[in-house]
Curated annotation (Swiss-Prot):
Disulphide bond pairs: none
Protein name (record): Recombination protein RecR
Domain Toprim: 74-168
Stretches annotated zinc finger (C4-type): 51-66
Classification of source organism: Bacteria, Bacillati, Cyanobacteriota, Cyanophyceae, Synechococcales
Organism: Synechococcus sp. (strain CC9605)
Function: May play a role in DNA repair. It seems to be involved in an RecBC-independent recombinational process of DNA repair. It may act with RecF and RecO.
Amino acid sequence: MARLIDQFERLPGIGPRTAQRLALHLLNQPQEQIHQFADALLAARTQVGQCQTCFHLSADPECEICRNPERRNGVICVVADSRDLLALERTREFHGRYHVLGGLISPMDGIGPELLRVTELVQRISNEEISEVILALTPSVEGDTTSLYLGRLLKPFCSVSRIAYGLPMGSELEYADEVTLSRALEGRRPV
């Protein structure tokens, strides 16, 4: 049981207590259900790869988004990973294409632009006649570094913008940090 708990703890957002609860829950399930769970996990790992165009997770050579003829072709939204892409898709506000970088520039972790899918992004911009790139990267040192790098690299080819950052709905101004408030002021829009 300790091995199972240890494996669950390796998952993002799962602490020791949750890992133990998950392990106990699985051990109380019928053998057939545990086999189905294991089969689904193995099938996902072997059958799901990356879209050859945008690098989003896909069981096919091209993902659903890239195959969709109703998506706008001239706009690419750049994200760090598929989790960010899925979060944006849940809003149903963006109707263009995506490009998954595979991470963010982080010199402290030894991750430079050459380890990300930057070359592929530049190739897409020149091959697909992209007019705008929207950078939807995390508001962090790494996200800012990556945005600055990409902005400088891509501006000669197309319009480059970054999504606005500010206060989450329902939050109180007095509890917001200075950086968040500064960005909220910078990203203000007319009413």
